[in-house]
Amino acid sequence: TASTDIYPLSLHDALPISSGQGHPDMKHIPGVDMSSGSLGQGISAAVGMAIAGKLDNADYRVYTLLGDGEIQEGQVWEASMLAAHRKLDNLVVIVDNNNLQIDGAITEVNSPYPIDKKFEAFNFHVINIDGNDFDQIDAAFKEAKTVKGQPTAIIAKTVKGKGVSFMENQVGWHGKAPNDEEYKIAMEELEKAGEALCQK
């Protein structure tokens, strides 16, 4: 069982019709303050929440997760410009950088690289990490909490489908649910990977 302080998630929750399905739904998942779907809208809402936090002198932080294909949307950069202008040091943007989107490799569709340099140009504090390494993820979140006067972008280099042999780095699994047999194999492989992580 995987869990966080906000949302306990069991492997069963990863089923296609469950609380862990597809896009996060704020009606069903504690800690999710906005349901997402249309690309680029999440960061705009996050910037608004971070501005509200500043106006209220609140000490909360706002986290938003973007796909690397999603940052092809102009709305992402409009929101980023405002976040930097407002010095939103209570905002952390995480970019899942796996180079795959529904149409194929993002480098072949409409490359946003170098992602880190683009966020730096918008005056973000940028942290590059291996997004499949939990220690690096933890260190990045801790570093982000120390940043003052500018938003943070964590550029997490990941492998899409990591831990499931037949899904790793395969664009065909973008938005596709496994059948019963594939699901069983995937869960077995993830259980083994999880056990190995716990032994570290």
Enumerate the language-model features and the residues they cover:
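Single conserved hydrophobic/aromatic residue that forms the stacking wall/gate
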Residues: 1-13
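Cofactor-binding active-site loop characterized by glycine-rich and histidine/acidic residues
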Residues: 10, 14-85
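Acidic, glycine-rich active-site loops and adjacent beta-strand->loop/helix elements
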Residues: 17-19, 66-73, 97-101, 132-134, ...
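Conserved thiamine diphosphate
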Residues: 57-61, 107-140, 191-199
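Generic beta-sheet signal
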Residues: 60-64, 91, 150-156
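A short alpha/beta connector and helix-capping loop motif
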Residues: 73-98, 153-155
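Short acidic, glycine/serine/threonine-rich loops at helix termini
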Residues: 75-77, 103-107, 164-169
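Glycine/aspartate-rich loop-and-adjacent alpha/beta segment that forms the canonical ThDP
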Residues: 134-200
